[in-house]
């Protein structure tokens, strides 16, 4: 399903004249009432939109609406034992289906047609959704559902389930289920409630919407004319005040208690702000997207006495809604459920049938087993790095991933592959001596050492689980008495030119492009780079591209210096590019005295900057004609007139100060680049198009794995997303002042900034899937331990926030599409839904290998949820989308 391609009338609107869409135009969505869908999916998606709209517009009775005083009473409670029974009304719409069936893509249409808040269960899910939405139109950043309901870093270590709860009825009522969930999540719920009420400054209600409503009445405007603009006039408003439709992608990764937590926080926030939707007695509508058979909710508990982290599986939101009779009947799930069928990631018929068998719990036949047999190879064949180069290995545990990465690095060191070079970078952990001593006192472990504590908490200190996958060396500790810190250092091994992913939302400085002429021409033609810069003003993006184009124009002349080119075509190329430059810069004599656009741009340069006048290179009075006077003459003496790129002699880019000047400069430089591209494309064809093309904002030298540059100033600040594909190009010690300022601002009080400035970590250099080169900021994560309601700021970790795509856990691969996949299952603890996730990552079964056939091995299978899904498929009220 795409965001363009077909049009259908909604809600009985009168048909109008057809919209003639020009290439590159954004489809018009007047009043957000028309959906632009792919014709093959249009009829299946329209009922989904209609039902969600109906649910979002249904009004409640006044007695059902929770009042603000109820939340004030909750904030005054010391324990959840005093929580009264109270219904928090909500509605649910489920969108489920097998892997790659288009569930997440459906959200594109929901986002365009309905006013909704789109979120993800995890950062990866949120950023994957952002990539889909921004691919069609510019999109606001997509946050996790935790961020939207107010979850904070100190809640990560909250102790869940401290207070036991027994349901008071059988079958349990909705009120009883919601009170159980609030009791289980009490520590977080209480903190969220107190923070929200404290933010009101002691006032009964927040004033943002009341002030706009008063202004509407004063100006005689229609109700809602101004209040609906509140998110624009008050940028800090919570997203839940904007809409009552909340979309959660990959909802199967959330524990069941988070369903009630989201509903509770929506009501609390809207009651506090007294929003128009609260005044209209509307309820939250949760659109839960995911697959209950693919995903599972996990909860971890750390035992301080044993220094051991235990992980257990809990009931997830999707399974909770589908299997719990009370919720199923309350939500009228038969009328609020859409199931997407058919794997669009891998469209092979036999493989698609296998995916349906695993998704819907259908009987596994001998024919299915024989089909999977063809993918089985010996385990040592998969774990041997010499085999299957370029394939992604999937393992069941982080320990297996780390072991394979160590084996891969050892192999690369021995073979010394020219393209793939192994190098190490330091990772630092700063442990507070004061907080560590307090931790030992509270846990009654006076003999505990920092080394032992760091080893046991390695997976908790960083802000991403993939840190356990890394091939790290022996840890070394240093004591800094002045700062009262212990600094633990690990050397982590990386592979140059390998595919990696960033694991957190990190700032990056884009400073150049490295790819081919064809790739850069494609960027300029469709403005894809500008569209992805939703974090900044587009003028900065155009100014940055102008710098790259100006620096890269000389590459066309460099290409013509390559040996083996036809001399006649080379001469013709020089002549035609010279004519193009003369035309663009208006170098030909003109009778009119009116200044041209190019001359105005050249004269608008910075003070003191003048283009070099190469016409002065002729013979001077009193000197011999054949002997150059200075070094500059020596340089140009070796070039004939055609080989000299006169563009640089007559044009100085300067720094445009207005929006119009920025666009004018970009248009001129873009015209120069595309004109030269067409000339060489016609003369040399594909040999030119695929030739290497690199351009940077400053002089750049790659010496082995290290990038050397004078200064990356002039680059573009942006954000590295987890959904982008990156290649590791090396590292640099060049300082980026914006990164250093952020470090001092955030971590000056912990003395970490001081130590990092004395011995700075390098920045990694990455190239994204489009070819743009970036320096990525250091990933700083803070670890706060929670012991008996006491919070200890134990450690701060500084690393690079990257993980390899050469190998990962099956859980990490959730939601990804991988070209070539080799899977190593663990025979003793095999879950069929995990095997389903791993196998469904591939885009072609031709590039799928595994160490065993999970269908023939002893495995666990969740048949309960499958029975409910099969029952839904037979229900005529459930929407089926093919």
From Swiss-Prot:
E.C. no: 3.6.4.-
Annotated coiled-coil segments of the chain: none
Keyword Ion transport carried by entry: no
Entry's family note: Belongs to the herpesviridae helicase family.
Function text: Component of the helicase/primase complex. Unwinds the DNA at the replication forks and generates single-stranded DNA for both leading and lagging strand synthesis. The primase synthesizes short RNA primers on the lagging strand that the polymerase elongates using dNTPs. Possesses helicase-like motifs and therefore may act as the helicase subunit of the complex.
GO MF: ATP binding; helicase activity; hydrolase activity
Protein name: DNA replication helicase
One record GO biological process: bidirectional double-stranded viral DNA replication
InterPro entries according to UniProt: DNA_helicase_dom, HSV_HELI, P-loop_NTPase
Key word Translocase present: no
Any one annotated GO CC term: host cell nucleus
Subunit field text: Associates with the primase and the primase-associated factor to form the helicase-primase complex.
Alphabetical keyword list: ATP-binding, DNA replication, Helicase, Host nucleus, Hydrolase, Nucleotide-binding
Region (Disordered): 1-29
Superkingdom of the organism of origin: Viruses
Organism in which the protein naturally occurs: Human herpesvirus 1 (strain 17)
Protein's cellular compartments: Host nucleus
Binding-site residues, ATP: 97-104
């Amino acid at each position: 399903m795409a965001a363009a391609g077909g049009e259908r009338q909604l809600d009985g609107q009168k048909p109008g004249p057809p919209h003639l869409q020009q290439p590159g135009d954004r489809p018009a969505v007047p009043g957000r009432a028309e959906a632009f869908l792919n014709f093959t999916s249009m009829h299946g998606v329209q009922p989904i939109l209609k039902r969600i709209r109906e649910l979002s517009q249904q009004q409640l009775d006044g007695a059902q609406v929770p009042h603000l005083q109820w939340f004030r009473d909750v904030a005054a409670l010391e324990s959840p034992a005093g929580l009264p029974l109270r219904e928090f009304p909500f509605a649910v719409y489920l969108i489920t289906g097998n892997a790659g069936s288009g569930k997440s893509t459906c959200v594109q249409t929901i986002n365009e047609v309905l006013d909704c808040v789109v979120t993800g269960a995890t950062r990866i899910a949120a950023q994957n959704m952002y990539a889909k939405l921004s691919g069609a139109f510019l999109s606001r950043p997509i946050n996790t559902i935790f961020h939207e309901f107010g979850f904070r870093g100190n809640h990560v270590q909250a102790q869940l389930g401290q207070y036991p709860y027994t349901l008071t009825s059988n079958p349990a009522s909705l009120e009883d289920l919601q009170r159980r969930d609030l009791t289980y999540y009490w520590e977080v719920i209480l903190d969220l409630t107190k923070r929200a009420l404290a933010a009101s400054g002691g006032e009964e209600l927040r004033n943002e919407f009341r002030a706009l409503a008063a202004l509407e009445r004063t100006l005689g405007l229609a109700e809602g004319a101004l209040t609906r603009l509140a998110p624009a006039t008050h940028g800090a408003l919570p997203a839940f005040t904007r809409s009552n439709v909340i979309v959660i992608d990959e909802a199967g990764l959330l524990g069941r208690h988070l369903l009630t937590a989201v509903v509770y926080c929506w009501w609390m926030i809207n009651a506090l702000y007294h929003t128009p939707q609260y005044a209209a007695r509307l309820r939250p509508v949760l659109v839960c997207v995911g697959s209950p058979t693919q995903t599972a909710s996990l909860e971890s508990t750390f035992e301080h006495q044993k220094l051991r982290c235990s992980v257990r599986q809990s009931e997830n939101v999707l399974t909770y809604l589908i299997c719990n009779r009370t919720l199923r009947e309350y939500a009228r799930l038969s009328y609020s459920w859409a199931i997407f069928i058919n794997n669009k990631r891998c469209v092979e018929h036999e493989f698609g049938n296998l995916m349906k068998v695993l998704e819907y719990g259908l009987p596994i036949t001998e024919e299915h087993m024989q089909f999977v047999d063809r993918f089985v190879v010996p385990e040592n064949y998969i774990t041997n790095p010499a085999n299957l180069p370029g394939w992604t290995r999937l393992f069941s545990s982080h320990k297996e991933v780390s072991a394979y990465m160590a084996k891969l690095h050892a192999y690369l060191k021995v073979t010394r592959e020219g393209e793939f070079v192994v190098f190490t970078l330091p990772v630092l952990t700063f442990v507070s001596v004061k907080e560590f001593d307090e931790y030992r006192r509270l846990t009654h472990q006076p003999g505990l050492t920092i080394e032992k504590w760091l080893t046991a908490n390695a997976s908790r200190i960083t802000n991403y689980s993939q840190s356990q996958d890394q091939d790290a060396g022996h840890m070394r500790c240093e004591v800094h008495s002045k700062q009262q810190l212990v600094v633990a250092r690990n050397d982590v091994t990386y592979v140059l030119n390998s595919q990696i992913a960033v694991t957190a939302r990190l700032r990056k400085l884009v400073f150049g492009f490295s790819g081919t002429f064809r790739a850069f021409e494609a960027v300029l033609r469709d403005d894809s780079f500008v569209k992805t810069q939703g974090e900044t003003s587009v003028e900065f993006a155009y100014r940055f591209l102008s710098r790259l184009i100006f620096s890269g124009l000389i590459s066309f002349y460099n290409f013509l210096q390559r040996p083996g080119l036809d001399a006649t075509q080379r001469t013709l190329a020089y002549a035609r590019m010279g004519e193009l430059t003369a035309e663009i810069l208006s170098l030909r004599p003109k009778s009119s005295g009116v200044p041209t656009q190019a001359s105005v741009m050249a004269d608008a340069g910075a003070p003191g900057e003048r283009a070099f006048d190469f016409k002065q290179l002729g013979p001077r009075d009193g000197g011999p004609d054949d002997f150059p006077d200075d070094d500059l003459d020596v340089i140009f003496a070796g070039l004939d007139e055609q080989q000299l790129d006169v563009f640089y002699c007559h044009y100085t880019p300067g720094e445009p100060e207005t929006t119009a000047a920025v666009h004018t400069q970009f248009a001129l430089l873009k015209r120069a680049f595309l004109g030269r591209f067409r000339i060489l494309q016609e003369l040399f064809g594909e040999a030119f198009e695929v030739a290497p093309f690199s351009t940077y904002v400053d002089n750049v030298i790659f010496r082995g794995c290290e990038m050397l540059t004078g200064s990356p100033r002039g680059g573009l600040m942006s954000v590295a997303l987890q959904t982008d594909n990156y290649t590791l190009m090396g590292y640099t010690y060049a300082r980026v002042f914006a990164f250093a300022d952020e470090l001092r601002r955030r971590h000056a009080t912990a003395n970490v900034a001081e130590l990092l400035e004395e011995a700075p970590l390098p920045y990694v250099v990455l190239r994204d899937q489009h070819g743009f080169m970036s320096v990525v900021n250091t990933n700083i994560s803070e670890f706060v331990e929670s012991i008996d309601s006491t919070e200890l700021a134990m450690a701060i970790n500084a690393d690079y926030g990257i993980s390899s795509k050469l190998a990962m856990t099956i859980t990490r691969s959730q939601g990804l599409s991988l070209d070539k996949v080799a899977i190593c299952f663990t025979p003793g603890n095999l879950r069929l839904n995990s095997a389903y996730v791993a196998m469904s990552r591939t885009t072609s079964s031709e590039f799928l290998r595994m160490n065993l056939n999970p269908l023939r091995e002893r495995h666990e299978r969740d048949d309960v949820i499958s029975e409910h899904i099969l029952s839904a498929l037979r229900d005529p009220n459930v929407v089926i989308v093919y």
